[in-house]
Amino acid sequence: MKPNESWTEDWRIGVSPAEEGKIGRELVAIFQRFWEWSDLENRSKSTRQRYSGALHALGSWAVEKAVEDNVPVDAHQLVLEATSGGDGPLIYLDREEWQKELDTVCRKLYKFLAFQC
């Protein structure tokens, strides 16, 4: 459940393996620091699962976005920009409840990232 290196394999799309791996590792590092900062290990199992699912989905979106844009990007800046509007990127178009959970996690992640600057 806690973000880990195996997530980078889930996020690979095969277009630019080197860039996908680089951005994926950066995202995992950010998500791990956020996990610690949020003290999620001391939260309920369901809370950890919600955060894990949202972070995993956000990571997948971020890797795809970075590769599609084909511009060198910093993972911190990419996620900061994606979460700065008060919500996260639209990932769950047909699943409003899942999108709300993602948005909640993204708001907290934004606070964490903004605090890091």
Description of each model-found segment:
Residues 1-117:
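Charge-rich, intrinsically disordered N-terminal extensions
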